[in-house]
UniProtKB/Swiss-Prot annotation:
This is Actin-related protein 2/3 complex subunit 5-like protein. Belongs to the ARPC5 family. The modification Phosphoserine is found at S64. GO terms for biological process: Arp2/3 complex-mediated actin nucleation; cell migration; regulation of actin filament polymerization. Transmembrane segments: none annotated. May function as component of the Arp2/3 complex which is involved in regulation of actin polymerization and together with an activating nucleation-promoting factor (NPF) mediates the formation of branched actin networks. It comes from Homo sapiens. It holds the Pfam family P16-Arc. GO terms for molecular function: actin filament binding.
Amino acid sequence: MARNTLSSRFRRVDIDEFDENKFVDEQEEAAAAAAEPGPDPSEVDGLLRQGDMLRAFHAALRNSPVNTKNQAVKERAQGVVLKVLTNFKSSEIEQAVQSLDRNGVDLLMKYIYKGFEKPTENSSAVLLQWHEKALAVGGLGSIIRVLTARKTV
């Protein structure tokens, strides 16, 4: 028993690695921000110019920055998604929403509610149309999951 208590193996664990308040160098943070996930704005713009709305929609929702704390990345992704949503024709919205799985509908709802937080000149009317179609596909559960989720977009 004395042999186990004198063991120093527990000292090899770096407990500061798990601390949220740990100091992070700004240069490391900037390098991590450059590698942050998010939709590629040039790819989405190219698809919008070609008129391929459905592929632009899926490209905008792909690699969403849910796990990052960098607000600049999140706002850039929100702008890209809002640009795609406002370019859709109202007759094509239902088809786009139905092409998503449950997690995709929840992610779309997160972006819709984020768009409601900061409305622009015509975005509220468009977002209400998207909300109607997403609610029809995802049900009330998608709203509850979005409002209770800890990870935001």
